[in-house]
Curated annotation (Swiss-Prot):
EC number(s) reported in the record: 2.4.1.227
Location in or out of the cell: Cell inner membrane
Natural source organism: Helicobacter acinonychis (strain Sheeba)
EC class name: transferase
Source domain of life: Bacteria
Predominant location category: membrane
Binding sites annotated in the UniProt record for UDP-N-acetyl-alpha-D-glucosamine: 10-12, 124, 183, 283
Protein family according to the UniProt entry: Belongs to the glycosyltransferase 28 family. MurG subfamily.
UniProt keyword list: Cell cycle, Cell division, Cell inner membrane, Cell membrane, Cell shape, Cell wall biogenesis/degradation, Glycosyltransferase, Membrane, Peptidoglycan synthesis, Transferase
Protein name: UDP-N-acetylglucosamine--N-acetylmuramyl-(pentapeptide) pyrophosphoryl-undecaprenol N-acetylglucosamine transferase
Gene symbol of the encoding locus: murG
Membrane topology recorded in Swiss-Prot or TrEMBL: Peripheral membrane protein
Catalysis performed (reactions): di-trans,octa-cis-undecaprenyl diphospho-N-acetyl-alpha-D-muramoyl-L-alanyl-D-glutamyl-meso-2,6-diaminopimeloyl-D-alanyl-D-alanine + UDP-N-acetyl-alpha-D-glucosamine = di-trans,octa-cis-undecaprenyl diphospho-[N-acetyl-alpha-D-glucosaminyl-(1->4)]-N-acetyl-alpha-D-muramoyl-L-alanyl-D-glutamyl-meso-2,6-diaminopimeloyl-D-alanyl-D-alanine + UDP + H(+)
Pathway assigned to this chain's UniProt record: Cell wall biogenesis; peptidoglycan biosynthesis
Gene Ontology molecular functions: UDP-N-acetyl-D-glucosamine:N-acetylmuramoyl-L-alanyl-D-glutamyl-meso-2,6-diaminopimelyl-D-alanyl-D-alanine-diphosphoundecaprenol 4-beta-N-acetylglucosaminlytransferase activity; undecaprenyldiphospho-muramoylpentapeptide beta-N-acetylglucosaminyltransferase activity
Amino acid sequence: MKVALTGGGTGGHLSIAKALAIELEKQGVEAIYLGSTYGQDKEWFEDSPLFSECYFFNTQGVVNKSFFKKIGSLFLQAKAALKAKEILKKHQITHTISVGGFSAGPASFASLLNKIPLYIHEQNAIKGSLNRYLSPKAKAVFSSYAFKDKGNHIVTSYPVQNVFFDHARTRTEIKHILFIGGSQGAKAINEFALFNAPKLTKQGIEITHICGPNSYERVRFFYQELGLLDKIVLFAFHNNIIEVMQKADLCVSRAGASSVWELCANGLPTIFIPYPFASNNHQYHNVLEFEKENLCYVVPQNELLPKKLFEVIRKLNQKDEQGHKNLTIISNKLQQKIAKDGAKTIIERILSA
């Protein structure tokens, strides 16, 4: 038995791949990885001990491109699929697991050509274009969201790494706020943090701000101009997100699925600002259920005024009839919403099929 893991491009897809790879290693199953030279795949897995071999193809996404660029991208995908076909055959792969993203294309199509069972994990509440096409052809599609086209879909707990559960805690007071601008550096969140920093620090609330590599110098300059550089903790990027997450009592973040469920597992109440240009507005749909259950606060980017933060803080500090803070109630309920060992459940279902 030998498994090929494929897909990525962004941290959300790659964090799932990592969680599944860790579980495969625990179960003594050898795995290889097939991704792209474009995006973050190499950064995550090029030297990873989780895989016996890693392959990175010259591929790019097709979505949101002009007609001629789409043709070029499809040509690269087809060329890579032929290479992937030979790689899967060479390694005698018995199962292929796709975590989605454009870099999953070549190995997924190669698996179908080689008649290797294909399993898909769909991370978002709205399927990506590749997964929409491949889902009917897959042996099973795993997701933490229930889709209308049930068919071969299996609802499981999100494959969050155990470290997020292990460092979970119930929040009782807002002493520390974490702003996550993401690897791309969300300008709206970065500016939201900068606007609110003077008042927050004046109130004695600590700030950790991950602003993204491309925004680091600009954001650092503005904190310096505000005279706050020595009063906040600023990162361009952080390799160990749980280290900063566990210290925080409130988070401000985009609504990528992996971030949503990692924050949930850690019991960290969050203000989500969904990326408004995400395909099919999937970031908003990722947190829609959470919002309906009063487990988070969702603020559209075009309504992100500085005062929103303090409105949410006031709501979180309010108490119910039993004297429990909303902050604590939400933190407890978040930890109950997601079960541990999502990756283990998925891998066991695949290996026993």
